Amino acid sequence: MKKEYRVKKDKEFQAVFTRGASVANRQFVVYALKKEQQTHFRIGLSVSKKIGNAVVRNQVKRYVREACQLHEASLAPNYDFVIIARNPAAKMTAQEVADSLRHVFKRSGVWKRQVK
């Protein structure tokens, strides 16, 4: 995922937290903030130290980025997303992460269409 497609600055994270809508399941919390001027969605990740050691946290982040790339065509383009991983995400495979995130994105209303 390209760096311009990531939410990186603290101000951007805080804007998504305060003005964005949140949807959650057991594995992830997703905050979504609509940005009309954007042509592509951006992703910010937060994985707590409670999830596990650095290896586990980095693996969860890689799986989330991979899932977002996989579902890139199905996500609304003009949103900033902040994805917070919960404890069960540490024991998930890449496919399970992708399925869980798809479920959360569908519930939040930013899913455009089915990917085959």
UniProtKB/Swiss-Prot annotation:
Q: Which domain of life is it from?
A: Bacteria
SUPFAM superfamilies attached to this UniProt entry: Ribosomal protein S5 domain 2-like (SSF54211)
Against InterPro entries, the record matches this protein to: Ribosomal_Su5_D2-typ_SF, Ribsml_uS5_D2-typ_fold_subgr, RNase_P, RNase_P_CS
What does the record give under GO molecular function? 3'-tRNA processing endoribonuclease activity; ribonuclease P activity; tRNA binding
What keywords does the record list, in alphabetical order? Answer: Endonuclease, Hydrolase, Nuclease, RNA-binding, tRNA processing
The family note in this entry says: Belongs to the RnpA family.
- Known function: RNaseP catalyzes the removal of the 5'-leader sequence from pre-tRNA to produce the mature 5'-terminus. It can also cleave other RNA substrates such as 4.5S RNA. The protein component plays an auxiliary but essential role in vivo by binding to the 5'-leader sequence and broadening the substrate specificity of the ribozyme.
What is the name of the protein in this document? Ribonuclease P protein component
